[in-house]
């Protein structure tokens, strides 16, 4: 049973790093405080979303003293933006970990990391990104509504930053909007806001609309659902 949150998230990070490096991957970003851990990694394989525009697949991890979220991750090399594909079938949300000993769920955590690293998972993400390059972004979808659904604070300020970035993009496609959102995420200092923006970027690329996360910390399972925004 977990009694020390930072020791717990440190153990999670060590296991995550081990699984990633075993697969010749690299941890590219880690943020840890007394109660939270955010980590992102990339695998060595590269695919092009457009000529000369390369993507790498990987895994994004978020952990608290009682929960772990694992999602496929897409990293765009040219601008060093990342998108979290929280809608992916291989995403995992492990709960009630503070009521268990670490070794009781270690194998489940390793399997979840391995699943997110699978080649077919990255291939699916690349198809979603390529499709996004061919679809004009309909701003009537109401980006402010999407931001609100993502559970983000200061949505009006974020909206202004995203729109400024979007109109600098060479094409006003769904891919361009994804890049605008993830560019703002990249430059955001708050790790939770950055995570949620990267989730939103992944959702836009895949043409889905996230519902807000549950505000009830006692919920046993994530209540996130997705509907098409195509």
Residue ranges and their predicted role:
Residues 46-230:
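Intrinsically disordered, low-complexity regions enriched in serine/threonine
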Residues 2-26:
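Amphipathic alpha-helical segments
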Residues 12, 35-37, 55:
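Residues at beta-strand starts and edge strands
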Residues 26-47:
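Beta-rich nucleic-acid/ligand-interaction surfaces
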